[in-house]
Amino acid sequence: ASEGNGRGPYVQADLAYAYEHITHDYPEQTGTKKDKISTVSDYFRNIRTHSIHPRVSVGYDFGGWRIAADYARYRKWNDNKYSVDIKELENKNQNKRDLKTENQENGTFHAVSSLGLSAVYDFKLNGKFKPYIGARVAYGHVRHSIDSTKKTTKFLTSSYGGLNPTVYTEENTQNAHHQSNSIRRVGLGVIAGVGFDITPKLTLDTGYRYHYWGRLENTRFKTHEASLGVRYRF
């Protein structure tokens, strides 16, 4: 039961819109990791996407300060990209040499779950509006994978004698990069928002939170979230 003066346990349900920024640090083609050349393109190294997901919280209101535990699951991101480039290497004596480069990439990223603990301070202003700020620490589980293949083909096109051109394959090479990880880390974030008291027990909540999930091996992941929800105090 409610203890009066705004104190008591509460539950909250939110619908959140998340902007997700995922940065992968795959081996480069130069520098200290040049012996581990990666075929991963910039598109999969620096991913910006978004998702909509539910979030539930259980907490206690001390009449100014609040503490809460929350849980959320995020949408799985996946994409694929194919590109081809043909570069002319030589063209003389009715013989033309070209280099064809094909890249096929398939990637997934899934913030499977986030279990957080937050401390929030409500500013008591006149009226029913209550701005708040807070901090959050969370245990996150992330899965990601990449499958990238780069194939090059060098071929000769001969038009000697004015006959129909004949194409000869001279050389083929193929490089691949495959990686799959399932990682758990503790990250930190900040919270801000405004609550509006519909009734003494029911509050409409609109909020923002930034969370840095920590460095997940060769991946950095952060989210910006805007949410709308309701909070009920018992």
UniProtKB/Swiss-Prot annotation:
Pfam families recorded: Opacity
InterPro entries attached to this UniProt entry: OMP/PagP_b-brl, Porin_opacity
GO molecular function, a single term: porin activity
Extent of the signal sequence: 1
Cellular component terms (Gene Ontology): cell outer membrane
SUPFAM superfamilies: OMPA-like
Protein's UniProt keywords contain Transmembrane: yes
UniProt entry keywords in alphabetical sequence: Cell outer membrane, Membrane, Signal, Transmembrane, Transmembrane beta strand
Main location as per UniProt: membrane
Localization in the cell: Cell outer membrane
UniProt family annotation: Belongs to the opacity porin family.
Job description of the protein: Implicated in a number of adherence functions. OPA proteins are implicated in pathogenesis and are subject to phase variation.
Protein name as annotated: Opacity protein opA51
